[in-house]
């Protein structure tokens, strides 16, 4: 597809997404328990669904068509900016999380720790806008985001103004990412135009990080910013400390970013890997990250009770999480024989152990390879083995791999598929496709495992020589 055609195709798709948001987005007074059928049967239902699916499809096609990069970085940035214009003025869509952000901010502003009680404890003046699952659940976010949410509510005092400010903050995250991604890409030997296009042009960014809006883009901006600073100044203590502080900011927004810190420490070393240089150079990165997290926690008066609150995100059950899908499938098979098996605690527990092993293994391999690329892989396995996987979680590895992977590959396909899993009012299609989705995901897990085992065996085979 010619680049100019891709630009206008994506803009048409973004305009259709905005139309579907105005007709059936995640409005404050919207229904909290709708289904695809109830949307179809409601006012403008067919138009809402058609605009959403066609719009997502157009954006996805344009993004995929130029997955190896457009004409230039400047062209990519201008195109992404054009695509975001209609979305910035649309009501929230693709998720209702912004209402939970606002109520958690109201709780904190009211003197209640959102890590100890749900938003119903205040109660939040906009409680009816929050999905029931989050009303009595502690916040699963880091202390910095709680501080930000509290400041937003204090500054605005209204729900609408808070949503506008949250979306503005998401836009700031996109702008900061637009600076950091080319820097990180150049250090990794990846075309900057491709990195910007893959990371910021993805439909996941439009439909979730901006449309939601979601706080993930703030975490990602600090994350890629920290990696860019570290990769650009190996062996320089002052700049490594700055990079570590940025990574700590990312962790203080969403704790998932912590898996990147050990890889950033490797990237900080000047010259070949040695334990001495790792301690000398990587220590500045780790120290900066720890200082940022501790500083924000103490400044917010939250102590470290927020660490326990981070485990609250696993209440949802959806087949988009591979370990959850395997557990669901085991239960379905048992039901065929008249049994009842709740395998979720087992499969999720195994996934946690496997994740720990894989992270250590990836770090060990990264010592003599590209730690920046392996940081992206670490985020990918973290998402894949999490007990709950929302579609926008795949933006985490997407941002890093877009700037560090030498070839576009599976991560682009995953992001493409994930773009179609949520409807404009925020309901997730996996909720209504469990009996089909879970077995299919389980089958995919089996196929991937077999492929990985065969690839590992092939890599060990000696190369024949004449």
Language-model region placement:
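Membrane-lumen/periplasm interface segments of multi-pass, membrane-embedded glycan/lipid transferases
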Residues: 316-347
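Multi-pass membrane glycosyltransferase architecture that uses lipid-linked
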Residues: 1-312, 348-466
